[in-house]
């Protein structure tokens, strides 16, 4: 099971997450409690292992701005949380992830229409896109087609207490956590460690 830690804002957390086995780190450039500047993101990314995915999170940003930040920071993927369509995705010409809020099984069908490398299924959006700590009914994704499952990233309120059930139900390619590995709004490296251990153990 691949694991993504999202909302990275400091070097120490990023390095520790990689040491503990994180496969991907997320850097939020959209409005968020976890927003990071491109300059700081670049400093962190330059110190990370080559095999770890560096994912930039954007919401309804222009293609030009996304391309500039991607190139300057050394991102490997972009994660799109807004109303981006296939025309914009094609123009980006960057490995991409489309985030969709899940409210019904029909969201699986909608997901198959996007020309992205991965689909991230999340809780329906609130004030901020993602990172709200709320789950959605995982059983809505229990019967997805194999070709979609193989590119599915599961997010939305995941933590050490529910990650095993979430993985058993959805069987995604990757799981994504942000608020579930925080204490009082800050990333907690011990929670990150335990989350990664549990996610990888229950998928063996």
Curated annotation (Swiss-Prot):
Pfam families: PRAI. It is an enzyme of class 5 (isomerase). Pathway: Amino-acid biosynthesis; L-tryptophan biosynthesis; L-tryptophan from chorismate: step 3/5. GO terms for biological process: L-tryptophan biosynthetic process. One of its GO terms (molecular function) is phosphoribosylanthranilate isomerase activity. Keywords: Amino-acid biosynthesis, Aromatic amino acid biosynthesis, Isomerase, Tryptophan biosynthesis. InterPro entries: Aldolase_TIM, PRAI_dom, RibuloseP-bd_barrel, TrpF_fam. It catalyses: N-(5-phospho-beta-D-ribosyl)anthranilate = 1-(2-carboxyphenylamino)-1-deoxy-D-ribulose 5-phosphate. Its EC number is 5.3.1.24. It comes from the Bacteria. Belongs to the TrpF family. This is N-(5'-phosphoribosyl)anthranilate isomerase.
């Amino acid at each position: 099971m691949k694991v993504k830690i999202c909302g990275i804002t400091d070097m120490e957390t990023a390095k520790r997450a990689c040491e503990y086995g994180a496969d991907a780190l997320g850097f939020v450039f959209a409005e968020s409690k976890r927003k990071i500047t491109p300059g700081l993101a670049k400093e962190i990314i330059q110190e990370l292992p080559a095999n770890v995915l560096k994912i930039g999170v954007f919401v309804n940003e222009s293609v030009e701005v996304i391309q500039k930040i991607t190139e300057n920071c050394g991102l490997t993927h972009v994660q799109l949380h807004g109303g981006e369509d296939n025309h914009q995705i094609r123009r980006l010409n960057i490995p991409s992830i489309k985030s969709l809020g899940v409210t019904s099984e029909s969201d699986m069908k909608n997901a198959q229409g996007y020309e992205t490398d991965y689909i991230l299924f999340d809780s329906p959006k609130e004030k901020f896109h993602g990172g709200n700590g709320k789950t959605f009914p995982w059983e809505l994704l229990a019967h997805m087609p194999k070709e979609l499952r193989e590119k599915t990233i599961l997010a939305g309120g995941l933590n050490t207490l529910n990650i095993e059930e979430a993985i058993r139900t959805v069987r995604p390619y990757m799981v994504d956590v942000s608020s579930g590995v925080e204490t009082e709004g800050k990333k907690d490296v011990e929670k990150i460690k335990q989350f990664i251990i549990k996610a990888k153990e229950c998928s063996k």
